[in-house]
Curated annotation (Swiss-Prot):
Keyword Secreted among record annotations: yes
Biological function: Manifests poly C-specific RNase activity toward yeast tRNA, elicits a dose-dependent inhibition of cell-free translation, inhibits formation of superoxide ions in vitro and inhibits the hemagglutinating activities of soybean lectin and Ricinus communis agglutinin 120. Inhibits HIV-1 reverse transcriptase.
Repressor is among the record's keywords: no
Protein name per Swiss-Prot or TrEMBL: Glycolactin
EC category: hydrolase
Chief localization: secreted
Location of this chain's protein in the cell: Secreted
Source species of the chain: Bos taurus (Bovine)
GO molecular function, one term: antioxidant activity
Enzyme Commission designation: 3.1.27.-
Keywords noted in UniProt: Antioxidant, Antiviral defense, Endonuclease, Glycoprotein, Hydrolase, Nuclease, Protein synthesis inhibitor, Secreted
Post-translational modification comment from the UniProt entry: Glycosylated.
Tissue distribution of the protein: Milk.
């Protein structure tokens, strides 16, 4: 949860944030998280959380 909050403070870095969250939170066991699609797509956002 802390990781989500930390990266959510950088609106301009949405794409990078998507990459990071996917890699550190779900990259080890799934390409998609339980709350959001972590694929690093343009305009990606964690608002789905």
């Amino acid at each position: 949860s802390a990781l989500y909050a930390l990266y959510d403070f950088s609106p301009p870095a949405r794409k990078m944030r998507a990459y990071t969250v996917r890699a550190y939170v779900h990259g080890s066991y799934s390409r998609r998280g339980p709350w959001y699609d972590f694929e690093p797509v343009p305009g990606a956002s964690m608002d789905g959380l």
